[in-house]
Amino acid sequence: MIAVPTGAAAAPRGPIPFYKHLYVQVLVAIAAGILLGHFYPELGTQLKPLGDAFIKLVKMIIAPVIFLTVATGIAGMTDMKKVGRVAGKAMIYFLTFSTLALIIGLIVANVVQPGAGMHIDPASLDPKAVANYAAKAHEQTITGFLSNIIPTTIVGAFADGDILQVLFFSVLFGIALALVGDKGKPVTDFLHVLTAPVFKLVSILMKAAPIGAFGAMAFTIGKYGIGSIANLALLIGTFYLTALLFVLVVLGAVARYNGFSILALIRYIKEELLLVLGTSSSEAALPALMDKMEKAGCKRSVVGLVIPTGYSFNLDGTNIYMTLAALFIAQATDIPLSLSDQILLLLVAMLSSKGAAGITGAGFITLAATLSVVPAVPVAGMALILGIDRFMSECRALTNLVGNAVATIVVARWENELDTDKLAAAMNGTPVVTDLVPQLEPAE
C-alpha cells in the first residue's frame, strides 16, 4: 500500500465543493463536448487531439504502474504456488463469464432481432469501408497472439506499452525477487519507494481527464452527429439494455453472493466510469482502478494479476457486442443462421475475443476477426455498423471496467486476500485515502 502522509499535512479538510470532484468535472466536460460537437461540428472534429493526447498520457504511465504493482505484490509472496493459483482462478472466472456474455448476446439477438426487416443486399455493401479492420483482423491469429505475449526485449515491452508483455515480464521479475530472498530485499524496497512518485504522477495526469473527455466527445458528435444513430437506434438500444442487465443481474448476483452490492461498487468507481465514458477507452482508467481495488481491500498481488490480465481476457461488454452485432448483420442481410452456425460463431468468438485490448476500436477489429472465420456472415456487412460503432464503444468499455472490478474482488475473496472491513467501508461510501483520486486532493 502507498504510504499516506501523517501529521498536519494529513489533517482532515472541510467539505470539498462539488465542482472540484473529478466525476463532476468530467460529466460537465462530456456535456460541453456534446453541445459543441452538435452546434459546431467542424470545430468539434478539430478537437480530437485533446482526447488522443490524454489517452497517450495515461498509456505513458500504464506500464510502470503494472510493473510496480505486480512485481512488488508477487515479491511479497512466500508461496510461489499462490501466484499460479491466483492466475488459475482468475482465468476460470474470465472464461466462465466471458462465455456467458457471448451466449447472452446470442440469445438477445435471436429474441429481439434488431436487424430484421432491413433487407440489405450483401452485394451492395462496400467492402473497402471495413478493409482496414479486416486486414488487422487477419493479422490477429491465436498463435500470433500467444507468441506475442513474450516480448522480444524488456525495453521493447515497455516502449510499446503492450499490457500483456509488461505483465509477463513483471510476473517473472516478481517471482525472481521472491526466490532470491533477502538478496532481493533492497530491490523490492526500492520499487516500493518508486511506487509513490509514479502513482503521484498518475494523480497529476488524472486532473487532465475533463479536457480529454471534452475533446473526445466533441470529436465523436462533430464527426458522426447525433442523428447518425437514429436509423440503427434499435441495435444500439438493445446493446445498451443487454449490457445494463448483464451488469445488474449477472454481475449483481455474483456481487451479492460474494458479499457486496453491484450498485455500491458502481458508485465507488464512478470517477473511473465517467472517465471511460468520455474517452471510450477502459485503458484510460486502468491505473486508477488498480489503486481503487487495492484501497477497497484487495491485496496488491491479486490486483496486479487480475486487472491487467482481465483487460485482454475478461471483456464482458465486448463479448456481448460481438455476438449481438454478428447476428444483427446476418438478420439485416437476410442470411439465416442455423443452430450449428451460431455454435460455430460462439466458439470462434470465445477464442478471438481473448486478444481484444482495452482501446477504442479493438472490439470492432475483434468482430472482423470473428466474421472472417465464420463463412455464413459477410465481413463487408460490418459497414452497416461502422458509423455507430463509436457510440457502442462507450458501453463496451463501461461494461468491461465493471466486469474487471467485480472479478478482482471475487478472486481476492476466493484466495482469502480480501480485507472485508475495507471493502465494507468502500462500498458504504466511507472516504478512502488514495493518491489517485483527485476529488480527495481538490484543485486550488
From Swiss-Prot:
Compartments it resides in: Cell inner membrane
GO biological process: L-aspartate transmembrane transport
PROSITE patterns: NA_DICARBOXYL_SYMP_1, NA_DICARBOXYL_SYMP_2
Keyword field contains Transmembrane: yes
Protein's membrane topology: Multi-pass membrane protein
Keywords: Cell inner membrane, Cell membrane, Membrane, Symport, Transmembrane, Transmembrane helix, Transport
InterPro entries listed in its UniProt record: C4_dicarb_transport (IPR023954), Na-dicarboxylate_symporter (IPR001991), Na-dicarboxylate_symporter_CS (IPR018107), Na:dicarbo_symporter_sf (IPR036458)
Membrane as UniProt keyword: yes
Chief place where the protein resides: membrane
One Gene Ontology cellular component: plasma membrane
GO molecular function terms noted in the UniProt entry: fumarate transmembrane transporter activity; malate:proton symporter activity; succinate transmembrane transporter activity
TM stretches of this protein: 21-41, 57-77, 92-112, 161-181, 201-221, 234-254, 320-340, 345-365, 368-388
Family to which this protein belongs: Belongs to the dicarboxylate/amino acid:cation symporter (DAACS) (TC 2.A.23) family.
Protein's job: Responsible for the transport of dicarboxylates such as succinate, fumarate, and malate from the periplasm across the membrane.
UniProt xrefs under HAMAP family: C4_dicarb_transport
Name of the protein described by the UniProt record: C4-dicarboxylate transport protein
Source organism: Brucella anthropi (strain ATCC 49188 / DSM 6882 / CCUG 24695 / JCM 21032 / LMG 3331 / NBRC 15819 / NCTC 12168 / Alc 37) (Ochrobactrum anthropi)
Lineage per the UniProt record: Bacteria, Pseudomonadati, Pseudomonadota, Alphaproteobacteria, Hyphomicrobiales
Encoding gene per record: dctA
